[in-house]
Amino acid sequence: MIVAGVDEAGRGPLFGPVVASAVVLKKEIYGITDSKKLTLKQREELFMEIIRNSYFGIGFASSSEIDKLNILHATELAMNRALAMLERKIRFDMVLVDGKNLKLDYKSKCIVKGDVLIKEISAASIIAKVVRDKIMTFYSKKFSNYALEKHKGYPTKDHIKLIEKYGLTPEHRLTFKPITKMLSINKLEEWYKSDIIDEERYKKIIEKLGVPLFGV
């Protein structure tokens, strides 16, 4: 039976996408474990080893999709996209996914602490983490005021202070706390009128804020 492991990176940040990976290993790879237990150097080295010795898929759900769907359903979307990419490379019989209460479009089983217990999930966690970190490094050049290369979008004290100083961006998750408390309604309406955020996302954010809709 061919088993695919699935995991994500980035459910907790205030900025950027959630990234998922799906992996079928071609052979056993020494040293694989939950990406959070590895150093940056170890993750990078294992990432290259996994890429060479597995079939893998990567999926994303954007900040906009997270605001529209909520983080749970956006995570499921990213995982389904990763599995769809993997499915184009190899057919698999079962999906093992880290966590609980995740409903995917494939025959699957949730494994609590699967990123430690199941090698395929561990491999997926490493790919997802490394890819998301690289995305944050890319975004750090576009949004240079926010030190994204350091905190990777997570709600650190430094990140919060930089938001307070420079304001929010459309790539922030605008339905997340404490973002909702820091969001300017005038800025939100400006983004909506300028088509920087679409109507569906605008409505979801307004609903979260509990204020009247503008021009909808």
Curated annotation (Swiss-Prot):
Its cofactor is Mn(2+); Mg(2+). Gene3D superfamilies: Ribonuclease H-like superfamily/Ribonuclease H. CDD domains: RNase_HII_bacteria_HII_like. Belongs to the RNase HII family. PANTHER family: RIBONUCLEASE H2 SUBUNIT A, RIBONUCLEASE HII. Manganese or magnesium. Binds 1 divalent metal ion per monomer in the absence of substrate. May bind a second metal ion after substrate binding. GO terms for cellular component: cytoplasm; ribonuclease H2 complex. The keyword Isomerase does not apply. InterPro entries: RNase_HII, RNase_HII/HIII, RNase_HII/HIII_dom, RNaseH-like_sf, RNaseH_sf. One of its GO terms (molecular function) is RNA-DNA hybrid ribonuclease activity. One of its GO terms (biological process) is mismatch repair. It catalyses: Endonucleolytic cleavage to 5'-phosphomonoester. Its EC number is 3.1.26.4. Keywords: Cytoplasm, Endonuclease, Hydrolase, Manganese, Metal-binding, Nuclease. Pfam families: RNase_HII. It is found in: Cytoplasm. Residues 1-188 form the RNase H type-2 domain. It is an enzyme of class 3 (hydrolase). A divalent metal cation binds at D7, E8, D98. This is Ribonuclease HII. Endonuclease that specifically degrades the RNA of RNA-DNA hybrids. Its main location: cytoplasm.
